[in-house]
């Protein structure tokens, strides 16, 4: 389903080499940045967003819901921001951002949350691996130790739990595996990254099998999109359309890009992931709204702007152009409109708005809504857009 008639015209490298006042957030006009070249302008905005978020890491009274989850320093919400910060650190070479990630890791002793098999608690490990790639041999061992223990325990006793998500609230029995689309961002890049960092193929083999299980359970081969979890396979939206949540697909698409960035070029499973990535890319380009944002429910146009899903999609598309997997003709119009939409969502102080709050389905969103994972998605997108723009003729 095409929702628009027309659109206007290293994390991986490091690992492989190592084997609040009241803000004003407006949809229009764009946040004010210096009238420089587009590559630099993307980084200027990314710095603004990163600096605002780093200055607001206490209290979280500006977050509408789930403040306790937001305050968890190794939980998925903060993890996504720090993953984005690693991308900005790589793009800028700014030691402030490098040290912010390292200081966060040191405060947490490079450890994890209390759930040893829950993908949400895996996500922070991507920042730990990045920091390990920037360390001395002794530091590296310390920064990888908890990650090895965590993943080795899963290898020693892999789960065969069914992938069905229950209707009850709270954690589900299937969440010892990747039975919801968000998990594809949280966990697979950690497994692929540890394989790259250590040279141990067992981690990548496990990732491959579990990722395929999630695709089998949740991927719609006709729409080339993911259901958030098994509850949504038979559900329909108010207009009768299948429900493909924007951020849920953003998690999956960004995770897929990050896995491809880490997977060896000659790996026998790489063609499988390339096919999945290209099919999703085409579907997502078709689903983009006329305003540059992706709708909160991808097959239902209209609704409010939303920046977390849009950020992940711009990131994944721009990464594909930079990696030579998508042609500029295919993807740049969508990237350009998506990045313009994201830019319009940054307030003068750097606060990112229009971020749907913590949830599991399409929901309402307002200009004042912000969250750390939205900022993380923005930073990931900015780093790739800047690289893409630096190569534009």
Show where each model-derived region lies.
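Extended ligand-binding clefts on enzyme/binding-domain cores
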Residues: 142, 181-185, 189-296, 303-314, ...
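Bacterial N-terminal signal peptides that target proteins for export
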Residues: 1-11
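Extended ligand-binding groove/face enriched in aromatic
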Residues: 98-102, 108-233, 238-240, 349
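CBM-like carbohydrate-recognition segments
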Residues: 32-79, 86, 91-98, 107, ...
